[in-house]
Amino acid sequence: RILDIDLYLHATKEDVFFEDDKEIGMISLRVATSMDIMSPEGVANSGRMENSAGGINEDEIWGKQAHWCDYSGVVDGKMVGVTLFDYDENYNHPVRWHARNYGLLTSNPFSTNCFNPELPKTGYNLKKGNSLIFKHRVYIHAGTTEEAKVVEKYQNYINPPLITIK
């Protein structure tokens, strides 16, 4: 299954400032608890996160830039997953990811310092009368990241086939 989500932000009455904060995201998901990487009690679970940069799970993904991030795990005895794709023309692409082993995954285009204190504070000021568009694809799949051909599906998203009608 594929969902394409286009988010249009327009500052109609005044400037809108998006803080450099890990809680700001343009698209988020929570997976079934059986897909969590760690249970709330700290017990290893069936889940696994992977991103386009080769990062695995929270320690290697949280706050890092990537074109996409996949969360896979077992639901009702079957390996399934969901991938968030960040469109290559989005502001601050590739985004940083607020990714947690307890099942949370969020793309965050506005923040740097909250993820890495050595980087400058950023944020974004959307001026009155201006707009900002974010495009994302949600890919819901069977199998692991590799089995679901996530890399190929991302390439299809950013380089769609050209169709000529004669």
What are these regions (language model features)?
Residues L9-K13, V31-M35, V138-A142:
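Beta-strand elements of well-folded, non-transmembrane domains
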Residues D4-Y8, S28, I133-R137:
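Beta-strand secondary-structure signal
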Residues R1, D21-E23, K128-L132:
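Solvent-exposed loop and beta-edge segments used for protein-protein assembly and interaction
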Residues R1, M35, K78, G103-P109:
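Asp-box/BNR beta-propeller blade signature and adjacent active/binding-site loops
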Residues F17, D21-N92:
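Active-site/ligand-binding surface loops and adjacent short beta/alpha elements
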Residues T83-K166:
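Beta-strand-rich recognition/accessory modules
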Residues V16, M38, G143-E147:
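Intrinsically disordered, low-complexity acidic/polar segments
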Residues R1-D21:
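Acidic, contiguous internal or C-terminal segments within carbohydrate-active enzymes
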